[in-house]
Every structure is written in structure tokens, then in C-alpha cells.
Amino acid sequence: CIRDRFGGMALAIITYVAISQLGYVITSRVAAYADAGAPLVYQNAWLMLQVPYGVIGVTLLTAIMPRLSRNAADGDVDAVVRDLTLGSKLTFIALIPIVIFMTGFGVPIARALFQYGAYGAESAEQLGLTISFSAFTLIPYALVLLHLRVFYAREEAWTPTFIIAGITLTKIVLTLLAPLMTSNPDRVVILLGTANGFGFVSGAVIGGFL
């Protein structure tokens, strides 16, 4: 019945959020343990990646979602696969130049936007390197969000929860390894940004198989 279906979806979404927050808490704790300013650097780097996705990725999703949702609701699997393939191709075409730019110019970007007042050159460089080493996250992140919308359109509420579980597990493992991979506390946050990216890579792979 509708009540049972709604209840199951609500439980799946709550579980999704709880798993996601677990990953965030662990990342924040590891970052703070390495360096007091690392959590802010990590958050700023993540926000910088959200800007191009918010402009380009959301636009692509908005353009393709009506057709994709309609085909998913109709149970037309072949059409959904075609739409998903198209969305993936458009994502690559739109975001690859931005990934290249942010990878190559992460430090100048951070210095231009953040280096003022108490935010010194060293902090800006740390942020810039974090942006550079995590810029690749944009593509798997966009693909994961595209996959999630497909599964929600098909009312497969638990599938996104399995995907976020894979993302978070990968992220936690790599996050816990980060302090062991460098003797420089300033570099831990850079590895945490990279760990976040590989988490979404695993999510994109899982979503592709499902």
C-alpha cells in the first residue's frame, strides 16, 4: 500500500543521510586531529567544487530529468539506459575542461579568492592544493547524482542507500589511511580531499553496475 511504500522510502532516505553523516564526521575528526585548520580547508575545497557542479551539473540534470523520469516511470529500461548514457556523455564533455582547469590552477584560484586578512599565503596554498588534488571528484560526483535520480524515479529507494554505503566505506578507509601516508600534517587534508573523490568513484562504479 501507499503507506508502506512511503514508510520504506522514508526509512531508506533516513539511513542514507545517517551513513553520509557518519563519513563526514569521521573525515572532520581526522582532519581536526591532523591540523586545527584542516576542517575549514576541507569544507572550502568541497564548496569550491560545488560551484561548477551547481552551474553546469544541475543544468544538465534539469534538462534531462523530465524525459528520464518519464521513461523510468513507464518501465522503459532501454530508454532509461539511453538517457543515462546521454547524461553521462554530457557530464564528461561539460566537466572535463573544468576539472583540468581546477587541477592546474587550484593554488592561484585559492589565492585569488581566499588570501586576505587572517587567511594567509600558507593556508591559501594548502586550500589550492586540496582543490587541485580533489578536482577529479566533480565527474564521479555528477555521475552518482545522476544515478541516484534514476533509482528514485524507479522507486528503488534502497539502491541509493547501498551506493552511499559503498561511497562512505571507501571514503572512511582512505580517510583513516591518510595520516599514515604522510608525515606532514598540512598534507593530510589534501589526501582527505582525494579520499572523498575516490569514494565517489566507487559510487559511480556501483551505480553503473546496478
Model segments located where?
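Membrane-embedded alpha-helical bundles of multi-pass transporters/translocases
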Residues: 3-210
